[in-house]
Amino acid sequence: MNEKRNGALDRYPIEKKRAGRPSVTVKEDGAVIFYLYAPAAKIVQVAGLGGYFTNKKIDLMPDGQGGFFAEVQDFHWGMHYYFWYVDGVRICNPYAGISYGCFAAINTFEVQEKNVDFYFAKDIPHGTVSICKYVSEVSSHLKECYVYTPYGYEEGDERYPVLYLQHGVGENETGWIWQGKANLIMDCLIAEGKCEKMIVVMSSGYAFKDGEKPVFYPGNFESELIHNIIPYIEKNFRVRKGRDYRAMAGLSLGSAQATDIVAKNMKLFSAAGVFSGVAIHEMERICDSDEQLDVVFMSCGTYEEQIREGMEQIEQKFENAGKYCISKVYEGYHEWHVWRKSLYDFVPLLFRKAGAETDDIPGERTARITRQRLQRQTMEEQILMFDPVYRQIRFETDEAGRPAGKYPDIPHGICITEQGTAVVCFEAPEAVSVEAALDGKEFLKLRKDQERQG
């Protein structure tokens, strides 16, 4: 491995080597080598999802020893989601870096942007990331949130303001840590004295009810945030309470949730961060409100033309109303390097003035979680998914042209019935046959689902 390559660029929950070779090697000159050991395969390819790593498939060449490889020169910097294809079947490579995206485990890797290191792991004091569980009164599920506390929190008695930070569609509460490096960004900002010390709470934004078929805003996350998450945080962490010490931000879907929730609850939040605002038109409600936020921040990538145009219109509306907002555009598409830079520029603006502390959150709403639900969630708990969301996103718009995506259910990869039977499912419409290896020895041949194509 390149000794000059920072550890933050290779931080994944899972990464292994196969046949003594890493699946992805990023060279000092910017080239990227892809490798997959697949001795029975005829064709192996990789492709991105769009943006700087397009969905055009790259062919890997056989190495004569059961492996396939390809070296791509001058690969563009950034954190990239991507897929592997073996004989036309899309797979997630278990030997490559894995994150949670597109409602599933997905492969990721990163190419460093030159002279950009604000999200690197450095020899500075580091905060703590805690994984906390709470009960959602909306879904009656046990859920997790990731909570960043600044260095020194455990030893002191100081109380801190809180930023509630939301992920994008298809991602979950893990996104801002593993893909976004939010904890490392906060460590750097605090160590350099560029921001106030604060707690950052990252939650799963899906508040689905069982059987619900929601559109763009998934379920009722507003209720879950105000009646479950915030009360939990204010009960279990040393926080400064009240509007002046509470902010909300998010990317993509999370930006839409932040805009909607802050617009409805201007007395509870003093700042809003809207990164790649897919519902940027909703910012008009914040502008038209009699309440005024201390910080209104909008951002997007240079190639997000519709969002950028919407930001310009909202910025003009704020100016006409005699109100202030900040608008930033960064080079890039709808991708994580844009959102990291957004967080880096947004956080230093927060909690800069002293305010009054108030106990303004309504009482916590409790929900009964069944024993069966707890048992099921216990058995399904994984490194990236505690309360798995088995959905896909179908992008649609309503009559006014606004986002109104739907979230159809997808079958679980494996499901254990009450009778103890294991049902295995794998979506592979291009495959001729699919087998599952049980205990690495016995192979189970899967039959085609007659009700669901693919």
Spans of features found by a protein language model:
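Surface-exposed, proline-enriched loop/turn segments that connect beta strands in immunoglobulin-like
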Residues: 21, 410-412
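Short Pro/Gly-enriched beta-strand edge/turn motifs at strand-loop
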Residues: 406-408
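Non-catalytic cap/lid and distal C-terminal segments of serine-dependent acyl enzymes
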Residues: 2-57, 61-395, 400-404, 417-433, ...
